[in-house]
């Protein structure tokens, strides 16, 4: 990134509509590398650093020269991108061609380019002289989208901007695919990846490290947001290596069915959904069902003496005594005395969603816009509510998050408990979450960090003095109390295989962390910095941010104010051109946020430049007014 741009800012105000200095510095790098040099870039910025806005600002710059295709994982994230495109346009302060920007979900992009599951090669010519931006790039490999991207790369010879945070380091295979897509050479995966008998023994070898450094030199942008302006994290439970874990000892009922399930799966259970299920809760005959929908159709089917299922509805005393789930017994007992909002992660959406819904209802918590809980718990005279988010949700997700994140819901009086599967591990932001729970252990340390990153990020908390509580729950045998202090104690398979499933998963996470940190270090080392005057294509964008910062602290200045002129000439060296720019923003009534007047427009008054607050008013019969000429970013679901 261009550190010369960062040096232009002093005490940057982040609390107003703004482009952060590192985002502008990265934008400069992207323009030079992708547009000027026609080379692909991996934007490896850690969660919460604003990758989306950087990518959209770059798309606006690039639209003046080429067509830009933006691919996102699903329709929900597409909606976020479309919203953020409006934000980026308002901050851009320069010309762009909206009709040259196309935003697609991967499924819609697939339908545009395949006929009967065969790539339509004749149609690929439309991508000549274009740029592709791929969000969550680690998700596109191993499927048709990854295949299509490789074909487009080889056929059209176009550059890619790949966005990713920590998940790119989940497996060396993913990193290998990234290298292959970004470089002009074909990668032999057998040469760069060492494979052992276990998943955790799949590593990027020294040859792979050298290939990574050689082929991606000058193509990596690494950035990690400083940990300032964030609340502290308080981990609960007993010490487990370098973190804390809550041991939830299973009842005899749960442990019995847990062991039956495990024996049937032998030692191949590390990623088996059935082991996720029984570690969360046991449900008798449901434990080993591959098609849960079949059993959901049963009527008054007894699972245990005190638990039945009828047409997909669980009922019985066991939902309250909770011998079926040591994790939920701990959770239900703990939340009764806690204040604030909760975010609860679980990975087994169908099975887990069933268990969660009826345990919560049976214990007095009401479904948001749904069934009321038994003897409901109240807050401010209203029932305490929960919602369950899975990948099956479409249009309702944004509305649900609007309620959960609203300032009126800071204490959870409208929606207190948000349960979510993997869909919430990417792209979404949660606000004012005070308690984060893991009902299942994530597959990777990167995914674990991503889930934390949905909540613990800049601008998500008004009061950062209050800590965020994290509960990592592990279902363990009734007599299991091992102290886990070193990975070196668990190098032999026979020692690992007898451990509870959740403990094995945690050890796997920590083993993989070593590889993750190694690749982080390599990517960080490869990320280039330089100090140059800003690229001509982003000068107006940069000046717009400098002006916003200047007039946040200045409500009224002389028209020939030396500080304003000095700021503008730090970018536009010619003083006459700098004065012309000042004339343009004043006569054009540039929009700023002032600390006294809030939303304001710049005006000339006699020999002064003043910030004039404004408010939009409208007649009751007016439904909407489009204040922007250019808004028609072409998108499809």
Curated annotation (Swiss-Prot):
Pfam families named in the record: Helicase_C, ResIII
Q: Could you confirm whether the keyword Hydrolase appears in this record?
A: yes
Q: Which GO terms describe its cellular component?
A: virion component
Cellular localization per UniProt: Virion
The EC number of this protein is 3.6.4.-
Alphabetically sorted, this entry's keywords are: Activator, DNA-binding, Hydrolase, Late protein, Transcription, Transcription regulation, Virion
What GO molecular function annotation could you give as one example from this UniProt entry? DNA binding
Statement: the UniProt record of this protein carries the keyword DNA-binding: yes
Enzyme class name: hydrolase
Q: How is it modified after translation?
A: Apparently non-glycosylated.
Partners and quaternary state? Answer: Heterodimer of a 70 kDa and a 82 kDa subunit. Part of the early transcription complex composed of ETF, RAP94/OPG109, and the DNA-directed RNA polymerase.
* Family (UniProt): Belongs to the helicase family. VETF subfamily.
Q: What does this protein do?
A: Acts with RNA polymerase to initiate transcription from early gene promoters. Is recruited by the RPO-associated protein of 94 kDa RAP94/OPG109 to form the early transcription complex, which also contains the core RNA polymerase. ETF heterodimer binds to early gene promoters.
Protein name as annotated: Early transcription factor 70 kDa subunit
Source species: Monkeypox virus
